[in-house]
Amino acid sequence: MKSGFVSILGRPNAGKSTLLNALVGEKVAIVTSKPQTTRNRITGVLEVPAKKKQPAAQIVFVDTPGVHKPGTQLDRRMMQEVYDALEARDIVILLVDASREMKIEETEELAGPAELAESQVSEARPGAPAVAETARKGDWRSEDEFVLNLVRKLDCPVFLAINKIDLIRREQLLPLIDSLMKQFPFAEVLPVSARKRDGLEALVEKLVEYLPTGERYFPPEQFTDQPERFLVAELIRERILMETGEEVPYAAAGVIEKFEEPAAQPAKAKKPRPLKGGGFAEVKLPVTNISAVIYCERDGQKAILIGKGGAKLKAIGTSARKEIESLLGTRVFLELHIIVEPGWRESRGFIDTLDWRKQLEDMAARQADVVGEKLGED
């Protein structure tokens, strides 16, 4: 058997989370059209059955925030998540957006090398190659170079996955692959469409080929290491991203304050009651009670999140509840509150509280305190 960790790296909106969900077959990462949707490392586990000339394998995929030059403390924390994901890995997938690369190529052809070099002066970074040297490298730009500098330091196989091939013409693909191959000695280059699931089988086969021999890291039935509380908070944030615009989605964060699971159901399930006209009455599912806080930075953002007569908050809650019910397999009572936390994106302490790993540590510490108090009373 083979097993190992595969980190998925790329610029914002390359389709990393869509690829992760498609590979795992479960929604473990939220997906929107807005950049910087992913803020944490997201783990997805894929069980690969053995087949002719291929052993069974467990691939632990790690989705990462979009690689970008950090501005706020939140940005820096997101980039730290990227660095951490690159430390514990056996293979790295560098994912690029084929449609974006082709647009860059067309823009460069229209502008010409001189105009392009002039336009990129503001993008130069300390220690980067001269602007004239990097102004035109096939389809490569300084933002891509920033991503590539991360993988140049790695000592593991790096795959180039060219995503969104369904958005470009077939005759454009080979020249694009040739252009991108000039940038780095990638171990493998694979065109894929995460949205349409094209090329994923070939990608998985190649990953298994490169993975080391080893045992499973997770039980076969487990598809992520994220707790349900975090998944629920992310689903709420996904709806905020989709329901609001401008700066509001980026200034919003969700924290689950209460997560009350229904009592354990009896082993013998209740059978549906037959109806007179045929069919069966719907069996009511148990209810999970959830209370969540949405944090934003300004009163104006809070007003937008609430909307006229509370309409926006209701829409966020209704759509999020449906997603959460699908995740949990229960009915859900969802209560949302909004709190203004000025400048939270620059507060390291506050950002720590949003990390689900830190939340689990705090919960464990509180439970230990309660147990200690009870033992002391006895």
Give residue ranges: language-model regions.
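Active-site glycine-centered loops adjacent to acidic/histidine catalytic or metal-binding residues
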Residues: 63, 163, 193
